[in-house]
A protein has these predicted regions:
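C-terminal motif of bacterial Sec signal peptides marking the signal peptidase cleavage site
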Residues: 15-18
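Bacterial signal peptide processing site
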Residues: 20-22
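Serine-hydrolase catalytic machinery in alpha/beta-hydrolase-like enzymes
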Residues: 24-35, 41-141, 238-242
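Primarily recognizes the serine-hydrolase "nucleophile elbow" in alpha/beta-hydrolase
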Residues: 131-191
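Short beta-strand/loop motif that positions the catalytic acidic residue
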Residues: 196-198
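Acidic catalytic loop of the alpha/beta-hydrolase fold
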Residues: 201-205, 234
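C-terminal catalytic histidine-bearing segment of alpha/beta-hydrolase fold enzymes
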Residues: 220-242
């Protein structure tokens, strides 16, 4: 496959892991994750608000593991995002799924989700503050390689992952799954490789937005791969989506 030659080793693994046609939801597939995966909640404070992110890793080596940070859908840090983190840990990564809203808050309806997500779209720098706060927690873990960090995100999280790629220069790669593409931030660097996995039938990502994104990436000379999957709608990686 030509696209695989364009990707870093980290992105290749993430491509197979999260773009495969897996019919089981991670939170319902504990048998697919080995018993050697350890999980824990990591709590910290950002500007007076408590956050409760989720880490997963295998304690099977003295060598620090490359890190993958997971930005959840707009529902918050649900079992789906935690399940993805556990699967990544099973693959040999140190995974951190980010609590984006604080206090581990989750919602189950679009109205509440929209209210929580809206500030990050209106003021994108808010997302950078939350991301940096979560990223700093990695330093607490000697088994995590702070110099090798990649980011993946789903839907809302995919949009925020792309924002991090536009603003960060030290990330090893960013993958967006069915996320919005244009969020008001222009690339400040072109050092981070990007993989976008988009559903061709996703009504939330129109052709005009795709064209604008590609133009922005090309103008900034960003190294990116855009996969547009036929007959795929929004949230196509989540079997529990409706």
């Amino acid at each position: 496959m030509k696209i695989l030659k364009m990707l870093t080793p980290v992105l290749i693994l993430l491509f197979y892991f999260a773009c495969s046609e897996n019919k089981k939801s991670p939170e319902n597939s504990s048998d697919s994750v080995s018993k050697g995966v350890k999980t824990e909640e990591v709590t910290y404070n950002i500007n007076g608000k408590n956050y409760k992110s989720f880490v997963a890793y295998k304690d099977d080596s003295d060598q620090p593991k490359p890190v993958v940070m997971v930005i959840p859908e707009w529902w918050g840090l649900t079992d789906y995002a935690k399940g993805r983190a556990k699967q990544l840990a099973d693959l040999g990564y140190f995974a951190l799924a980010i609590d984006f809203y604080g206090e581990g808050k989750t919602v189950d309806n679009p109205t509440d989700a929209g209210k929580l997500a809206e500030p990050f779209y209106k003021i994108p720098v808010n997302a950078k503050t939350v991301f940096d706060g979560a990223k700093a927690q990695i330093l607490k873990y000697p088994n995590a390689d702070y110099g090798k960090i990649a980011v993946i995100g789903y839907c809302f999280g995919g949009a925020q992952a792309l924002n991090m790629a536009r603003q960060e220069s030290d990330l090893k790669g960013v993958v967006s799954f069915h996320g919005n593409l244009m969020t008001g931030i222009k690339p400040k660097n072109n050092k981070v490789k990007i993989l976008v996995c988009n559903g061709a039938d996703d009504s939330f990502v129109p052709e005009e937005e795709i064209a604008a994104f590609k133009k922005q990436m090309d103008s900034a000379k960003v190294s990116y791969t855009f996969n547009n999957y036929p007959n795929s709608v929004h949230s196509f990686t989540n079997p529990a989506s409706t």
